[in-house]
């Protein structure tokens, strides 16, 4: 029987110890985890557990895409090990001092960066998340309680044993990383209410998981990783820029959260831009769901294919996660901004050579990341120079956009005096 109170208490105690660990010790633990992933015996144990999960998934009729996401291979373990070593090489945010000042009364004041404490992470059928989250939490001084999808229970348990062994070998508390290996869904609800021990919940999965966590939690929940992504092609856009940016944003990895969902095109350039974009995307088997004006322009340009279909209004509020793109022709920047304000908050981009229009777009669009003449696919911790990420938050509190090491910390005020008393 899984006792979450015990797990929470052990995590809290381990987190207090971990918060005081020097960077060198934390890095040594991360290096030990990476080495363990590459060790033949350890890898064999993890792969055997994963093979059992995959076999059970196939028997349950899971989709090929889901089976692929949950499958580990020696090559994927090597990539996870490399990512863990990358985290070891990142700057440690814990203990950083900032906003230092000396007050008129002589008090010396600064803020000091500290871990959040205990992080609960609930995720779906991606066993690699087990190690990714563990690495980021360890480096930022946080304990973690992990709950992977029921499809990968064996894989998560095997990876957590490997991590805990590495922690013990390097003198860090093994309870800093724990997994709930019981697939009972009721335990997820219990975790969401474990506010005596857990400081924050980070869900990683689909819209249903995020909604469930928001509705059931008595703990702060940082949601994100879901949202409709837009590109607006301005009348001053460079056609040579438009086609490769749209292609990259839509085609490179259509199933991820920063992939393009809706293309908005200025009416003044739609007749020129749309055929070139459509020709490129159709060659990559993208289905285009277009409004009436876009359909007329594409028909006039000679396009007649079942891959181009009339858009429904509901197609403009959908995160497709597939080779599907909705397209709308707009009168200009104001209409594009109105559309994005209604549907966007994740990753939104403008393609234009006009600096004033670009700045107006950046100022007006209220999303976690806004791009000028660049693909939405760059809304990623690794791509934005953070090294790694635990999630992409679309909230405004506590963090926004890619959440990396610094976003897994808070701060405390430190006030130093010389016998000061308040008047």
UniProtKB/Swiss-Prot annotation:
Location(s), subcellular: Cytoplasm
Family annotation (Gene3D superfamilies): Aldehyde Dehydrogenase, Chain A, domain 1 (3.40.605.10), Aldehyde Dehydrogenase, Chain A, domain 2 (3.40.309.10)
UniProt entry keywords in alphabetical sequence: Amino-acid biosynthesis, Cytoplasm, NADP, Oxidoreductase, Proline biosynthesis
Ranges in a coiled coil: none
Main location: cytoplasm
Oxidoreductase recorded as keyword: yes
GO biological process: one example: L-proline biosynthetic process
InterPro entries reported for this sequence: Ald_DH/histidinol_DH, Ald_DH_C, Ald_DH_N, Aldehyde_DH_dom, Glu-5-SA_DH, GPR_dom
Pathway(s) this gene product operates in, as recorded in its UniProt entry: Amino-acid biosynthesis; L-proline biosynthesis; L-glutamate 5-semialdehyde from L-glutamate: step 2/2
Pfam families (alphabetical): Aldedh (PF00171)
Cellular component annotations (GO), alphabetically ordered: cytoplasm
Enzyme Commission no: 1.2.1.41
One Gene Ontology molecular-function label: glutamate-5-semialdehyde dehydrogenase activity
Physiological role: Catalyzes the NADPH-dependent reduction of L-glutamate 5-phosphate into L-glutamate 5-semialdehyde and phosphate. The product spontaneously undergoes cyclization to form 1-pyrroline-5-carboxylate.
Name this polypeptide is given: Gamma-glutamyl phosphate reductase
Source species of the chain: Roseiflexus castenholzii (strain DSM 13941 / HLO8)
